[in-house]
Amino acid sequence: MEAFPVIDMEKLNGEERAPTMEKIKDACENWGFFELVNHGISHELMDTVERLTKEHYNKCMEQRFKEMVATKGLEAVQSEINDLDWESTFFLRHLPVSNISEIPDLEQDHRKAMKEFAEKLEKLAEQLLDLLCENVGLEKGYLKKAFYGSKGPTFGTKVSNYPPCPRPELIKGLRAHTDAGGIILLFQDNKVSGLQLLKDGEWIDVPPMKHSIVINIGDQLEVITNGKYKSVMHRVIAQPDGNRMSIASFYNPGSDAVMYPAPALVDKEEDQQKQVYPKFVFEDYMKLYAGLKFQAKEPRFEAMKAMENAVNLGPIATI
């Protein structure tokens, strides 16, 4: 079994830049995931974010989760549950407008730490997008511009805790899915594992590493690269012991950004491979995704292509 790709970002600044870029390229094409170390975000900040997030769960979220479990009778389930996940979550929005000040129950130091962490992640996401541009042969800044829309990209964070589960064989922490958006940056618990990705028909553990950031490719990067980079199915396995923390930040296109394969990449393709993916508004894709998240991505792309064809075949407006 190949080793899970771990990228040391410090190596991008010296003689090992070329093999490191090749490793990123291989990860994007064949894994859809890679793990970053020496990414420039201070360990002290990450430790603070982790401590405050776990304290917040214990103080404000744990009892609510236990009440939900009791209400739904989940501790006594005898058959597989396919319509919910064993997770406790809340969401933060950073771009286009932050809502961190509006989230109830967050201590002021937690708000401050999450805001600083999000700012660092935003810069890291944009740095990574330029590395992906370089690897695939697009001009620097292309992916950021493609995500822009009229108000810039959207950027938000899903803060999750996965408590100990009495029946992990019957309930997933998070059911298998691909991510709808652009590039995802995950700060995960380094003690309790659970994240897995699907590669060559097998579920592979994403290894928990202290102070690393796990990166994965969303559906929109697959579209823009015309399939060169792949979003892959992943899931979270609930665990009988330990509470797993997950802070996933999603750097996505703006809601009105128009997604389509980069012409520079399409032009290089053989005729039959010219444009495999449709052209659509990101918000329309998200509406479709909301109901089909836990299904394969290909029917979503086909549905968007059908919508595109319907628009193209429609009457021409005259004024």
Swiss-Prot record:
One of its GO terms (molecular function) is 1-aminocyclopropane-1-carboxylate oxidase activity. Pathway: Alkene biosynthesis; ethylene biosynthesis via S-adenosyl-L-methionine; ethylene from S-adenosyl-L-methionine: step 2/2. Pfam families: 2OG-FeII_Oxy, DIOX_N. This is 1-aminocyclopropane-1-carboxylate oxidase. Keywords: Ethylene biosynthesis, Fruit ripening, Iron, Metal-binding, Oxidoreductase, Vitamin C. PROSITE patterns: FE2OG_OXY. Belongs to the iron/ascorbate-dependent oxidoreductase family. Its EC number is 1.14.17.4. The gene is ACO. Disulfide bonds: none annotated.
